[in-house]
Amino acid sequence: MAVPKKRTSIYKKRIRKNIWKKKGYWAALKAFSLAKSLSTGNSKSFFVRKISNQTLE
């Protein structure tokens, strides 16, 4: 079984953790941007069918 020879430094650990956090931040930002464009109707990646509020008589 492969075992690391030395302990990972706190400096490297912090860098890796920040990279991981930044990926989550960008994913959340993209999701929020997409939701915003869908709600305003300016989305270019989704085709949303608009339902009219007509009553059947």
Curated annotation (Swiss-Prot):
The keyword Ribonucleoprotein is assigned to this record: yes
InterPro entries: Ribosomal_bL32, Ribosomal_bL32_plant/cyanobact, Ribosomal_zn-bd
Keyword annotations: Chloroplast, Plastid, Ribonucleoprotein, Ribosomal protein
GO terms of molecular function: structural constituent of ribosome
Compartments reported by the entry: Plastid, Chloroplast
GO biological process: translation
CC annotations in GO: chloroplast; large ribosomal subunit
Subunit structure of this chain's protein: Component of the chloroplast large ribosomal subunit (LSU). Mature 70S chloroplast ribosomes of higher plants consist of a small (30S) and a large (50S) subunit. The 30S small subunit contains 1 molecule of ribosomal RNA (16S rRNA) and 24 different proteins. The 50S large subunit contains 3 rRNA molecules (23S, 5S and 4.5S rRNA) and 33 different proteins.
Job description of the protein: Component of the chloroplast ribosome (chloro-ribosome), a dedicated translation machinery responsible for the synthesis of chloroplast genome-encoded proteins, including proteins of the transcription and translation machinery and components of the photosynthetic apparatus.
HAMAP family hit by this protein: Ribosomal_bL32 (MF_00340)
Protein family according to the UniProt entry: Belongs to the bacterial ribosomal protein bL32 family.
Stated name of the protein: Large ribosomal subunit protein bL32c
Taxon lineage: Eukaryota, Viridiplantae, Streptophyta, Embryophyta, Tracheophyta
